[in-house]
C-alpha cells in the first residue's frame, strides 16, 4: 500500500522584546537562574498583568507579513494545566480570539518549485519556566527566568507532505521572523521551537489519520530526522496490524527515535476561559496602517527582486535571500564588482564553504563584502585567473588584506602578454615533442583528451599566472599549425 504523510507544525517564536509580556522583568538569555522572575511572573496574590504593547506590535507585524486577517479585537484566555515550571497553574494564551487569523507563506522546495502553506493562526502567549534535571542529585531544579517571556505561536494548516517540506517551511518562518526583527531565531537557545504533528493515510484517502505530536524540536536537522522516524514508525505499526494512538512524543537525537511522553490533550482538557485580569485588545485601523508602513522588504519579495533584477535562478535567489544578513552581503558584493552572477557564485561557493567549515554566520565572515567584490573585479579585468583567485580568497580569509594588496605582495598578477605566453608555450611543446607528434596523428576524440595535458603543462610552467583563455587559443594554433 502507498502512504501519504500529513504534517502540521506549531512554531513557538520568542519575541525580541526587552521585557516580558505581562511584567517589566528582563528577557535576556543566560542570566543566573531565578534572577529574572518578578512577583507577576510567579503569580503571587495581589499582582496584576500589564500587556506589553511591543509584543502586540510584533504579532501584528508578522500577521501583515503573511497576508493574514488581523482581529480587530482579540482576547487572552487562561490555559489550565499543572506542571512544575508553570508557577501560576495556568498559562495566559489566546484560544477563540487570536490576534492573527488565516494567512499563508510560500516555500521554495529543493527542485525550485514554490508551494503555498496555509497558516491557521498565530497567537500571543507567555512561556513557561524551565525544568533542569542535571546536577541536582536525582532531583529536578526549576528556573523561572523564562516564565512570562512573550511567545508567538504560529500554527500551520496540515498542508505539508514530507519532512523536507517541513524543514523548508520552518526555514521560511525562521527567515521571516528575523527579517521582521521580531525574533532572533536562535534555535540552540530555544528562541524558535517546533512541535510537529504527524499522521499517515492511504494515498488517495481524504480523511486524516491519527496524529502524534513531537514536542519541542529545536534544529532543522532534528526536525527532518524526527518526522522521518515518526512516519516510518506509524507505517510499520499500521502494516503490522496495530493502531496509532493520539499522543505526545519526544525526539531523542542520541538514539534517533521518538518515544511516548503522554496522551495528547484536547482543547477542552485545558478548560480555557477568558482571562479576568486582561481587557480585550482592540486593534485600530490606524495602528495597522502604521505597522504596515514599517514592514521591510520580505524574503519572498527579495527573492523575486533578485530574480528579476539580477537574473538569478529561483534556487540561487532563495539561498541568497534566506537571511537579511546574507542578502545584504550579496548585494554589497554585487555593487562593488558590478556582476551579480559572479557575486552569487562566490558567495554561495567559496564563501559559504568557508563559513560552514568554520561554523560562522555571514555577519562573522572574515572576508568583507567589499574585499570579495574587489577580488571579483580583478577576475573580470583579467588581473588574476579563477584559479589564482582561490589563492587570493584564502589569503583574504587569513586576514592578509585586500585582493589588490595580496596580488601585489605575492606577485600573483596574471600574465596577459601574448609574446611571453607564446615563448612559454614553445618551451612546453619542445619539452613534450613526442606528445605533440601523437596529438597531430590522433583523431578529434583523442585530441580533446590530450589537449588538456598541454594546458596543464602550460599552466604549471607559468605557475598558474598565464591567462587561461589566451593559453587555450595560442596553444590550439601552435598544435594545429
Swiss-Prot record:
InterPro entries assigned: Asn/Gln-tRNA_amidoTrfase_suB/E, Asn/Gln-tRNA_Trfase_suB/E_cat, Asn/Gln_amidotransferase, Asn/Gln_tRNA_amidoTrase-B-like, GatB, GatB_C_1, GatB_Yqey_C_2, Gln-tRNA_amidoTrfase_suB_CS
Pfam families xref list: GatB_N, GatB_Yqey
Catalytic activity: L-glutamyl-tRNA(Gln) + L-glutamine + ATP + H2O = L-glutaminyl-tRNA(Gln) + L-glutamate + ADP + phosphate + H(+); L-aspartyl-tRNA(Asn) + L-glutamine + ATP + H2O = L-asparaginyl-tRNA(Asn) + L-glutamate + ADP + phosphate + 2 H(+)
UniProt KW keywords: ATP-binding, Ligase, Nucleotide-binding, Protein biosynthesis
EC number in record: 6.3.5.-
Gene3D superfamilies in the cross-refs: 1.10.10.410, GatB domain, N-terminal subdomain
GO molecular function, one term: ATP binding
GO biological process, one term: translation
Subunit organization: Heterotrimer of A, B and C subunits.
Family: Belongs to the GatB/GatE family. GatB subfamily.
Its job: Allows the formation of correctly charged Asn-tRNA(Asn) or Gln-tRNA(Gln) through the transamidation of misacylated Asp-tRNA(Asn) or Glu-tRNA(Gln) in organisms which lack either or both of asparaginyl-tRNA or glutaminyl-tRNA synthetases. The reaction takes place in the presence of glutamine and ATP through an activated phospho-Asp-tRNA(Asn) or phospho-Glu-tRNA(Gln).
NCBIfam families xref list: gatB, PRK05477.1-2, PRK05477.1-4, PRK05477.1-5
Protein name (database record): Aspartyl/glutamyl-tRNA(Asn/Gln) amidotransferase subunit B
Species annotation: Ectopseudomonas mendocina (strain ymp) (Pseudomonas mendocina)
Gene it is expressed from: gatB
Amino acid at each position: 500500500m502507498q502512504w501519504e504523510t500529513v504534517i502540521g507544525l506549531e512554531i513557538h517564536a520568542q519575541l525580541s522584546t526587552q521585557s516580558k509580556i505581562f511584567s517589566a522583568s528582563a528577557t535576556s538569555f543566560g542570566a543566573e537562574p531565578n534572577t529574572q522572575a518578578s512577583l507577576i511572573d510567579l503569580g503571587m496574590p495581589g499582582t496584576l498583568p500589564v500587556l506589553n504593547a511591543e509584543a502586540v506590535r510584533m504579532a501584528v507585524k508578522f500577521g501583515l507579513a503573511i497576508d493574514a486577517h488581523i482581529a480587530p479585537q482579540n482576547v487572552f484566555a487562561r490555559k489550565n494545566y499543572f506542571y512544575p515550571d508553570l508557577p501560576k497553574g495556568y498559562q495566559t494564551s489566546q484560544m477563540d480570539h487570536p490576534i492573527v487569523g488565516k494567512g499563508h507563506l510560500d516555500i521554495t522546495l529543493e527542485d525550485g518549485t514554490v508551494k503555498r502553506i496555509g497558516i491557521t493562526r498565530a497567537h500571543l502567549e507567555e512561556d513557561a519556566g524551565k525544568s533542569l534535571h542535571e546536577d541536582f542529585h536525582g532531583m529536578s531544579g526549576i528556573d523561572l527566568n523564562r516564565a512570562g517571556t512573550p511567545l508567538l505561536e504560529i500554527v500551520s494548516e496540515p498542508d505539508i507532505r514530507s519532512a523536507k517540506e517541513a524543514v523548508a517551511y520552518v526555514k521560511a518562518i525562521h527567515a521571516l521572523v528575523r527579517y521582521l526583527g521580531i525574533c532572533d531565531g536562535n534555535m540552540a537557545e530555544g528562541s524558535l521551537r517546533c512541535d510537529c504533528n504527524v499522521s499517515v493515510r492511504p494515498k488517495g484517502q481524504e480523511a486524516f489519520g491519527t496524529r502524534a505530536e513531537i514536542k519541542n524540536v529545536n534544529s532543522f536537522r532534528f526536525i527532518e530526522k524526527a518526522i522521518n522516524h515518526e512516519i516510518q514508525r506509524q507505517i510499520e505499526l499500521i502494516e503490522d496490524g496495530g493502531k496509532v494512538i493520539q499522543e505526545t512524543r519526544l525526539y531523542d537525537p542520541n538514539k534517533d527515535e521518538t518515544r511516548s511522553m503522554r496522551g495528547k490533550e484536547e482543547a477542552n482538557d485545558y478548560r480555557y476561559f477568558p482571562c479576568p485580569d486582561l481587557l480585550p485588545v482592540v486593534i485600530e485601523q490606524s495602528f495597522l496602517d502604521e505597522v504596515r508602513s514599517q514592514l521591510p522588504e520580505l524574503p519572498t519579495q527579495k527573492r523575486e527582486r533578485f530574480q528579476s533584477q539580477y537574473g538569478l535562478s529561483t534556487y540561487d535567489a532563495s539561498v541568497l535571500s534566506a537571511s537579511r544578513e546574507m542578502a545584504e552581503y550579496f548585494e554589497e558584493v554585487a555593487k562593488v564588482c558590478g556582476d551579480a552572477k559572479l557575486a552569487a557564485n562566490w558567495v554561495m561557493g567559496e564563501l559559504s564553504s568557508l563559513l560552514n567549515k568554520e561554523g560562522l554566520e555571514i555577519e562573522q565572515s572574515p572576508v568583507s563584502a567589499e574585499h570579495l567584490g574587489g577580488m571579483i573585479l580583478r577576475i573580470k579585468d583579467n588581473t588574476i585567473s579563477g584559479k589564482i583567485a582561490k589563492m587570493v580568497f584564502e589569503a583574504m580569509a587569513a586576514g592578509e588584506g585586500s585582493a589588490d594588496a595580496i596580488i601585489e605582495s605575492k606577485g600573483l598578477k596574471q600574465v596577459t602578454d601574448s609574446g611571453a605566453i607564446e615563448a612559454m608555450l614553445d618551451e612546453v611543446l619542445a619539452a613534450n615533442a613526442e606528445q605533440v607528434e601523437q596529438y597531430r596523428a590522433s583523431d578529434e576524440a583523442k585530441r580533446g583528451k590530450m589537449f588538456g595535458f598541454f594546458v596543464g603543462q602550460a599552466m604549471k610552467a607559468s605557475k598558474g599566472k598565464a591567462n587561461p583563455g589566451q593559453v587555450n587559443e595560442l596553444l590550439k594554433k601552435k598544435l594545429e599549425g
